[in-house]
Regions:
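A glycine/proline-hinged amphipathic helix-loop "lid/cap" segment
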Residues: 1-61
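Alpha/beta-hydrolase superfamily serine-hydrolase fold, recognizing
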Residues: 53-60, 64-285
């Protein structure tokens, strides 16, 4: 991409003013993690949801559509699925002839990664027994989870999805490769991410591939499409992970938004429209 659009500049300015204060304050993120309530009640939305073994799953599009997309939402493992995810899932269903399923998974700090792995594994087993043309997709923390999950299912002899598509995935939950572009990221902060990452990992080590896919085995993973902005805190870690994927022989396409911020393909902008065209092209191959 070339010069950043005016719309994206305005969006970034707004994001800077609305950046959560706990992302840059150890005291505030610790307070958040000590007081945040669990998401036990169903999420309310105008969109339809179903129940899968006790897990709420939002659905978009025709159940008989040619393609199936499982979208694992981001939010640093503490933020619930939101309007941005709903709208993107709706767009996917309308433009890609896809039945989109978006699980509402347990969040930190009351829950940790192991619980979500169990729920998503059961859900995925049912899915691959009944549907074809499956794509696993996710943004930010959800993107990192998708990558870890696809590494994990190799160990239990479950089939890979047909493709993996992730936006700004959190690939190193321990943030082990400083320095990071903390000041320039209008959404995320290193201080907050480090503490949240510990909470999400629970009893697992921060370098356990199930929470940090950059440390996992990438051989024989499904083909991938990965997006990142070069002005986001995760850019360096994602770039390093993409190199590991290539070394391990994974068929990966890496798209970098010049001057762009975290999960930029999910925002309304010319850059996001260009990103969606790339996503759409994957469904025509």
């Amino acid at each position: 991409m070339s010069k950043k659009s005016f719309i994206s500049k305005i969006e970034e300015l707004i994001l800077n003013f609305t950046k959560p204060d706990y992302m840059d304050s150890k005291e505030k993120v610790e307070e958040l993690l000590s007081t945040k309530e669990s998401n036990e009640n169903p999420v309310k939305s105008i969109f339809k949801s179903i129940d899968s073994n006790g897990m709420q799953i939002f659905t978009f599009g025709d159940e008989n559509a040619e393609n199936t997309i499982v979208f694992i939402h981001g939010g640093a493992f503490i933020g619930e699925i939101n309007y941005q995810h709903f709208l993107y899932c709706y767009l996917l269903s309308r433009k890609l002839d896809a039945y989109v399923l978006a699980p509402v998974y347990p969040l930190a700090p009351k829950h940790s990664a192991n619980e979500t792995f169990e729920l998503i594994t059961d859900f995925y087993k049912d899915l691959i027994s009944s549907r074809n043309n499956i794509v696993l997709m996710g943004d930010s923390a959800g993107g990192g989870f998708v990558l870890s999950f696809c590494q994990y299912i190799k160990t239990i002899d479950l089939a890979q999805p047909d493709e993996i598509i992730v936006f700004s995935p959190w690939v190193d939950i321990g943030m082990s490769n400083p320095p990071y572009k903390n000041e320039s990221d209008p959404i995320l902060g290193e201080v907050g991410l480090r503490e949240i990452g510990k909470s999400w990992a629970g009893d697992w080590s921060l370098d356990d591939y199930r929470v940090s896919p950059t440390f996992g085995d990438n051989k024989n993973l499904a083909k991938m499409l990965i997006f990142a902005g070069d002005n986001e805190i995760f850019h360096k870690d994602i770039l390093s992970y993409v190199e590991k994927l290539k070394e391990d022989g994974v068929d990966v396409k890496f798209v970098v938004g010049e001057g762009m911020f975290h999960i930029y393909p999910l925002f309304p902008s010319p850059e996001a429209r260009a990103a969606f065209k790339i996503v759409k092209a994957e469904f025509k191959d």
